[in-house]
């Protein structure tokens, strides 16, 4: 099927979509992956470095290193599933962060500036069309009938608290 044929192409596209220059004077960070990138903008090189264990946790640290101080905008993609997201630049809280939008940080950047992004990665029970799924950040937990480990339509009760939060426990 098309997923088997086209799925591997997505991995090759990661470097092209992780960072993007949508307009003059702006660079977007779309994916949160440990990485280092150099972007040419405004007649200089700007190095961006990401440190993260995402999606194991929701913390991302981005270091910005322009060759010289420069004014430009960094757009952080805020995932739609993150109900509570915090963004800081050099320890100062950024206001107006909204799920499903870009957080635009316009400032004069200097070498060593740090952006901290903390996403709300709690597991949540999602119920739609008489079906259930558990989402934990960008990961959707699903049951696959191909494993033949029971009847897929078998009813189950997934306990939640604080609305739709699910407690998950890792197994080894």
Predicted features along the sequence, with ranges:
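C-terminal beta-rich recognition modules with glycine/proline-rich loops and embedded aromatic residues
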Residues: 1-63, 98, 107, 118-172
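A general secondary-structure signal for short beta-strands and their flanking turns/coil
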Residues: 57-59, 71, 112
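Histidine- and/or cysteine-centered catalytic micro-motif in compact active-site loops
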Residues: 67, 79, 120-122
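Surface-exposed loops/turns
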Residues: 68, 99, 110-111
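Beta-strand-rich binding/interaction modules
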Residues: 69-89
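Solvent-exposed beta-strand/loop surfaces of large extracellular or lumenal domains
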Residues: 82-107, 125-129
């Amino acid at each position: 099927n098309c997923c088997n044929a086209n799925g591997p192409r997505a991995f090759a596209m990661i470097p092209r979509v992780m960072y993007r220059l949508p307009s003059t004077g702006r660079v977007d960070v779309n994916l949160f992956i440990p990485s280092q990138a150099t972007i040419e903008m405004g007649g200089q090189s700007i190095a961006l470095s990401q440190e993260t264990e995402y999606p194991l946790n929701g913390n991302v640290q981005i270091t910005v290193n322009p060759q010289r101080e420069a004014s430009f905008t960094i757009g952080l993609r805020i995932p739609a599933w993150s109900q509570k997201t915090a963004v800081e630049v050099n320890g100062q809280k950024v206001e107006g962060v909204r799920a499903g939008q870009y957080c635009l940080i316009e400032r004069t950047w200097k070498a060593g500036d740090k952006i901290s992004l903390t996403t709300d990665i709690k597991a949540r029970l999602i119920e739609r069309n008489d079906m259930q799924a558990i989402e934990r950040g960008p990961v959707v937990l699903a049951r696959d009938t191909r494993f033949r480990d029971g009847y897929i339509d078998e009813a189950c009760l997934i306990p939640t608290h604080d609305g739709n939060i699910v407690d998950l426990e890792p197994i080894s």
